[in-house]
Regions:
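Bacterial Sec-dependent N-terminal signal peptides
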Residues: 1-24
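C-terminal non-catalytic interaction/assembly regions of soluble proteins
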Residues: 272-352
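Accessory alpha-helical/coil subdomains and C-terminal extensions
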Residues: 25, 31, 55, 59-66, ...
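Short, acidic/small-residue loops that bind anionic groups at enzyme active sites
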Residues: 122-153, 159-163, 288-297
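A glycine- and small-aliphatic-rich helix-loop capping segment at beta-alpha/alpha-beta transitions
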Residues: 44-53, 117, 123-136, 151-157, ...
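ATP/NTP phosphate-donor binding region
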Residues: 23-98, 281
Length: 352
């Protein structure tokens, strides 16, 4: 009997130890949206593929090591290439993340996402998630069937980042190819290279190495719990478009922006957000119609500054500061849910 009691006691202790280990690991939930990380190709050596084909359960099976660092669960939100990302999916993601964090039993979120518009989704969530818990976007430049696919290690590093206590309060981040990049500054810089995501204006926040995160800095821009924007009761976003400037641009490219219900226009200008003489009268007309105009630049680095070659105060234009056109569009959409005062919107661009 004594032997049986000892065996029972040992078994009970083993069960308790196992449950304690599970309980001590953070709970990480993965929201899958598709993209190259879930893509399949006809050949392991070719770059052509179909995005968004692999389910999240299959992706996790390829990286069993994540279960050693976290209790990982997942759900499929959509299965799309991120070139088809849209406002409806953004709103779904933001609301779902806020719902998960409100429950109290989720410690971090990982979002698998295509790289084409990842920086836009990350920035949108950076402004609409209402928690200081980690939200990490991750993708791949090579499909899951490719020789030397980058997705599995990227996914592992993303879970490591989301599970780390040090990641709290950093805002929404992108974890790609070993780097941890803040949503404000991250951008895709190469069409095919695995080291495509960089933060050329500010640098990476940190990196992941051997299953550990190392942070060197954090963003001073407002985000997440410090954000003014709330999408809880929104089912759509204001209509905002981007008009691209180039040599000999014709004024008629502005016609749809003036006639099709746009509430805001981001001008992707040359140099420091400069505007071609053919477009200037059309942008003035937009302001007269109550359409907000933000000046950004097609140049990948450097800010678009107030009152450089354009008198923004005179024309009531907003300068995007360090935000590229696609991110300026995101902030303008959210700003328009709060106000149409161009001066207040300029304040938003100064701090976000």
């Amino acid at each position: 009997m004594n032997g049986l009691r000892k065996l029972s006691l040992m078994a009970a202790m083993l069960v308790c130890t196992t449950w304690a280990a599970v309980a001590q690991k953070p709970n990480i939930h993965i929201l899958a949206t598709g993209g190259t990380i879930a893509g399949t190709g006809a050949s392991a050596t070719k770059t052509n593929y179909t995005a968004g084909q692999v389910a999240i359960s299959t992706l996790l099976e390829a990286v069993p090591e994540v279960n050693k660092i976290a209790n990982v669960t997942g759900e499929q939100i959509v299965k799309i290439g991120s070139q088809d990302m849209n406002d409806a999916v953004w709103l779904t993601l933001a609301k779902r993340i806020n719902e998960l964090f409100s429950r109290g039993d989720v410690d971090g979120i990982v979002i698998t996402h295509g790289t084409d518009t990842m920086e836009e989704t990350a920035f949108f969530l950076n402004l609409t998630v209402k928690s200081d818990k980690p939200v990490v976007l991750v993708g791949a430049m090579r499909p899951s069937t490719a020789m030397s696919a980058d997705g599995p290690l990227n996914l592992y590093n993303a879970v490591v980042t989301a599970a780390a206590r040090e990641s709290r309060g950093k805002g929404v981040v992108i974890a790609m190819n070993g780097l941890i990049l803040g949503a404000h500054g991250a951008m895709k810089t190469n069409t095919v290279d695995v080291q495509t995501f960089q933060s050329p204006n500010s640098g990476a926040l940190g990196y992941v190495l051997n299953g550990k995160v190392f942070y060197n800095m954090e963003s001073l821009k407002r985000h997440t719990t410090g954000s003014d924007f709330d999408v809880a009761h929104l089912d759509k976003l204001p209509k905002v478009g981007i008009v691209y400037s180039y040599s000999n641009v014709e004024a008629d490219i502005m016609t749809p922006f003036l006639n099709d219900g746009y509430q805001g226009i981001v001008h992707a200008g040359v140099g420091n957000g400069n505007i071609h003489q053919n477009l200037f009268p059309m942008l003035e007309k937009a302001r007269q119609q109550g359409i907000l105009v933000v000046r950004s630049s097609r140049v990948p680095t450097g800010p678009t500054t107030l009152d450089a070659e354009v008198d923004d105060n005179k024309y009531q234009f907003v300068a995007s500061q360090e935000l590229n056109p696609q991110k300026a569009r995101v902030l303008l959409m959210l700003a328009l849910t709060k106000t149409k005062d161009w001066k207040k919107i300029q304040e938003y661009f100064n701090v976000y």
